[in-house]
C-alpha cells in the first residue's frame, strides 16, 4: 500500500532539498578557571562566537536515502535541526520542495517526519496508540485515511499488540518502532532519522532497516540518516555526506569510497622466519607481532595472490589470515584522511 504521492509539479529527478551556503553560529560564554575569573564573569560576562556549521551546501533528489555522517561535534545535529526548522541558519538558505523551513513552517511541518533516537514524542504513561490518535488531531487528518495509514504502518513494523501497551513498559526496540510509525502517520515526504537504531538488538535493527527501505522504494520517501552505526549506512544509503568541524568534507557514492579506501587488505603471516628488507610495491605497513607479521597492502597496486607468492618463495609460511575491510574501517580511514 503506497501511502504517499508526489505532489503535483514534483520532479523526482530535480533537487528536492537544496541547501545553499548555510552557516550557524552560537554565542558561548567564556569560562576561565579560578575564583577571580568567576567573580569577574558574574559582573561582566565575556562571549565568544562558535561556528557550528560553516558554509554548507548540498542538494538531494526526491527518493534518495543519504547518510549524513561525522564524528561527535561535527555539526550533524545542528544541520538536521536547521533542515527540520528547529533552528534558523545565521546565513544561507534552505529550500525543501520550494518551502522554507522557517518562513513556511506551518505547511512545511506537515510534510516532514523526524525521529530522534534519544528523544521521544510518545507519552510514556499511555499506550502509543493514544499518542497516534492525538497526532491525528494535531495534523487534522481525515479519520478514514488515518486508520488506513495506521494499519499499514502497524502491520509493516509488526507492532499490532505493542501499541496497546503503555510506552514505559516497552523495550527500546519496540518503542523505536512506535516512534517511526508516529512520525509517518501524516504521510510526510521527508524523513529525518537521527540515530534510529541506537541501542537496538540485531532483530530490531533489521526490522527498522527493512521498513525504511520499503517506504523509500514504494513511496519515494526521501530519507536523511545521521548515525554512528556504519552498518546502517551500508544497508540503507548509496550516498554519504561527511561533515567535520562544521564543513562538508566528502559528498559522494559509498561504492566510490570503498574503491578508494577498501583496497587496503590486512594480512597476517604466521612464520618462524624473520621477514625483513622485503621490497614489494603496495605494502603500506608491516609490523612484527608476537607470533606473526601483520601486513597492510593496497590491492590496487599488488594483488593478494601476487603478494603471497612473493613471500612463499622466500619464507616458510605456516599460516595466513586475510581480513576484509568493513565499512567501519573504510569510514575510519576517511576520518583519518581529514584528521577528524
Q: Where do the protein language model's features map onto the residues?
A:
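Conserved ABC ATPase "signature" region
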Residues: 34-41, 133, 137, 144-162
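Short, charged/small-residue-rich alpha-helical element at the C-terminal edge
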Residues: 266-340
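Conserved ABC ATPase signature
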Residues: 166-170
Amino acid at each position: 500500500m503506497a501511502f504517499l504521492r508526489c505532489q503535483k509539479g514534483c520532479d523526482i529527478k530535480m533537487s528536492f532539498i537544496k541547501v545553499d551556503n548555510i552557516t550557524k553560529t552560537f554565542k558561548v560564554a567564556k569560562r576561565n578557571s579560578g575564583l577571580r575569573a568567576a567573580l569577574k564573569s558574574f559582573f561582566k560576562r565575556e562571549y565568544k562566537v562558535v561556528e557550528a556549521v560553516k558554509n554548507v551546501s548540498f542538494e538531494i533528489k526526491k527518493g534518495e536515502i543519504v547518510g549524513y555522517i561525522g564524528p561527535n561535534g561535527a555539526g550533524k545535529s545542528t544541520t538536521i535541526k536547521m533542515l527540520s526548522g528547529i533552528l534558523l541558519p545565521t546565513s544561507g538558505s534552505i529550500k525543501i520542495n520550494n518551502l522554507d523551513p522557517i518562513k513556511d513552517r506551518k505547511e512545511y511541518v506537515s510534510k516532514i517526519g523526524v525521529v530522534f533516537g534519544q528523544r521521544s514524542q510518545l507519552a510514556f504513561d499511555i499506550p502509543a496508540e493514544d499518542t497516534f490518535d492525538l497526532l491525528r488531531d494535531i495534523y487534522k487528518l481525515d479519520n478514514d485515511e488515518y486508520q488506513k495509514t495506521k494499519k499499514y504502518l502497524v502491520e509493516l513494523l509488526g507492532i499490532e499488540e505493542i501499541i496497546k501497551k503503555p510506552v514505559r513498559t516497552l523495550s527500546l526496540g519496540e518503542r523505536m518502532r512506535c516512534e517511526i510509525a508516529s512520525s509517518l502517520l501524516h504521510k510526510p515526504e521527508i524523513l529525518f532519522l537521527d540515530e534510529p537504531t541506537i541501542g537496538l538488538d540485531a532483530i530490531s535493527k533489521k526490522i527498522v532497516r527493512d521498513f525504511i527501505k520499503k517506504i523509500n522504494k514504494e513511496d519515494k520517501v526521501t530519507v536523511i540518516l545521521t548515525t554512528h552505526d556504519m552498518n546502517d549506512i551500508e544497508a540503507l544509503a548509496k550516498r554519504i555526506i561527511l561533515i567535520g568541524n562544521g564543513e562538508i568534507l566528502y559528498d559522494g557514492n559509498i561504492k566510490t569510497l570503498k574503491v578508494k579506501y577498501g583496497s587496503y587488505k590486512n594480512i597476517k603471516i604466521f612464520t618462524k622466519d624473520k621477514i625483513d628488507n622485503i621490497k614489494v610495491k603496495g605494502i603500506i605497513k608491516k609490523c612484527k607481532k608476537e607470533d606473526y607479521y601483520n601486513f597492510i597492502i593496497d590491492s590496487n597496486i599488488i594483488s593478494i595472490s601476487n603478494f603471497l607468492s612473493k613471500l612463499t618463495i622466500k619464507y616458510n609460511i605456516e599460516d595466513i589470515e586475510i581480513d576484509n575491510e568493513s565499512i567501519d574501517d573504510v569510514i575510519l580511514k576517511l576520518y583519518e584522511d581529514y584528521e577528524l
